[in-house]
């Protein structure tokens, strides 16, 4: 699709969404005096450091790098493997109150514990193939793109994370897996607090 720009970044995505909703936005601009969204947003595509990364080498060995910093927060990132997707990032937020690291969508990777070293909270995606009956091609894609829950605990342990929170939980079975089972799987190799995340949940640093 869109052969002239098949791999749009955040700037292109945002501009295309703005164009797609132009009619509605124009109505509200003229009829209600709302602010022009283009004047209240600043979009930045993340520039990947020169580490040999490409669509053929999506997550090479690298150090975390700063993507944003002000007097309240420092945000660092690292490339992670997410199947054919490039770039895919994990992010870490450091503040005076503590640190939180988000794995983002990622297959099992040593990049996450490198970024998340000694973080207060590691928020990590998780999937389970227990009882999976779908197409083999989809299973292959998912295994290359996501992390099985049974390995998330060892990632948290390697990072020395203070707490592990499961998110983006992919239950690939026909019969839903109970929350306690996700918790038990995630605790394998990790002896600290584990939380199975849910909608609208709040976790204090």
What residue ranges belong to the model's regions?
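Binuclear metal-dependent hydrolase catalytic cores
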Residues: 1-98, 178, 183-204
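Short beta->alpha connector loops
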Residues: 81-84, 105-109
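Cap/insert and terminal regions of metallo-dependent hydrolase folds
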Residues: 89-90, 96-101, 107-201
